[in-house]
């Protein structure tokens, strides 16, 4: 049984479906959760569900100073889950430099800053769990998402490098790469589009946000103390690597 009692977890992008599921599960397992995002209303709604043992931190990940401050404001930090991310999809020949840059800045650079600042804090206690949320397309690629795929592939490479650097300090760094997870985005697909995607998934269905949360909870636990530098794929077999 996973027990996170006494641990403090910071989850970015907690106002979204996957981030909310992660926050709820880590909280259920006993962790104090710092839920962060840019949508205060949604964070407050999540807080109403959690009821206690949580803190809300509003943060704009496009602002480097806010990224650093988000970590420094936490009096204690045992678990960091970098879940926030954005998309700005179009074919490469139509993609503007600023569309590429803003996705890289939030999905990769902001997460690097969060990882770096969290490591500084975790090194003091010689303990930490960092979980970066990547994506299936960080491995497979996807047309119209050169910027997003680059950011998610970069996140996996960064995770591996950091895991080498901090392994002797009691800190593990891993990634979780979700496949097609049921969300507001997938709900907008028409029936034909949904069927085409499901046909590519051996388990024959979309994943749920809770499936991703379960992988995160395991990596955040002491049961995963001998796992670092790895990417856990939660995709129903859609991509086997």
From Swiss-Prot:
Pfam families: adh_short_C2
Keyword Oxidoreductase: yes
SUPFAM superfamilies in the cross-refs: NAD(P)-binding Rossmann-fold domains (SSF51735)
Catalytic-site annotation from UniProt: 148 (proton acceptor)
GO BP, sorted A to Z: fatty acid elongation
Keyword hit for DNA-binding: no
Residues binding NADP(+): 13-16, 38, 57-58, 83, 148-152, 181
Residues annotated as binding substrate: 135
An MF annotation (GO) of this entry: NADP binding
Keywords, alphabetical: Fatty acid biosynthesis, Fatty acid metabolism, Lipid biosynthesis, Lipid metabolism, NADP, Oxidoreductase
InterPro entries: 3oxo_ACP_reduc, NAD(P)-bd_dom_sf, Sc_DH/Rdtase_CS, SDR, SDR_fam
EC number: 1.1.1.100
Pathway connected to this protein: Lipid metabolism; fatty acid biosynthesis
Catalytic activity line of the entry: a (3R)-hydroxyacyl-[ACP] + NADP(+) = a 3-oxoacyl-[ACP] + NADPH + H(+)
Entry's family note: Belongs to the short-chain dehydrogenases/reductases (SDR) family.
UniProt subunit comment: Homotetramer.
Known function: Catalyzes the NADPH-dependent reduction of beta-ketoacyl-ACP substrates to beta-hydroxyacyl-ACP products, the first reductive step in the elongation cycle of fatty acid biosynthesis.
NCBIfam families from the UniProt entry: 3oxo_ACP_reduc, PRK05653.1-4, PRK07231.1, PRK12826.1-2
Protein's name in the database: 3-oxoacyl-[acyl-carrier-protein] reductase FabG
Originating organism: Rickettsia felis (strain ATCC VR-1525 / URRWXCal2)
Gene assigned in the entry: fabG
């Amino acid at each position: 049984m996973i027990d996170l009692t006494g641990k403090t977890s910071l989850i970015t992008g907690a106002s979204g479906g996957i981030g909310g599921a992660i926050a709820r599960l880590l909280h259920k397992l006993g962790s104090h959760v710092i839920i962060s995002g840019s949508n205060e209303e949604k964070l407050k709604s999540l807080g109403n569900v959690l009821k206690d043992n949580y803190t809300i931190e509003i943060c704009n990940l496009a602002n480097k100073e806010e990224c650093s401050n988000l970590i420094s404001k936490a009096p204690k930090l045992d678990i960091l889950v970098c879940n926030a991310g954005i998309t700005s999809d179009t074919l490469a020949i139509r993609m503007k430099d600023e569309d590429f840059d803003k996705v890289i800045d939030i999905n990769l650079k902001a997460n690097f800053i969060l990882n770096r600042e969290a490591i500084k804090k975790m090194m003091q206690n010689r303990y930490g769990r960092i979980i970066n949320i990547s994506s299936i397309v960080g491995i497979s690629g996807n047309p119209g998402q050169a910027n997003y795929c680059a950011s998610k592939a970069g996140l996996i490479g960064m995770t591996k490098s950091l895991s080498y650097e901090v392994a002797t300090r009691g800190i593990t760094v891993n990634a979780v790469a979700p496949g097609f997870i049921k969300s507001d985005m997938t709900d907008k697909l028409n029936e034909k589009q949904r069927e085409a995607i499901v046909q590519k998934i051996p388990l024959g269905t979309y994943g749920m946000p809770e499936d991703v949360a379960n992988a995160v909870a395991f990596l955040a636990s002491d049961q995963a103390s001998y796992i670092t530098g790895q990417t856990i794929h939660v995709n129903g077999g859609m991509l086997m690597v």
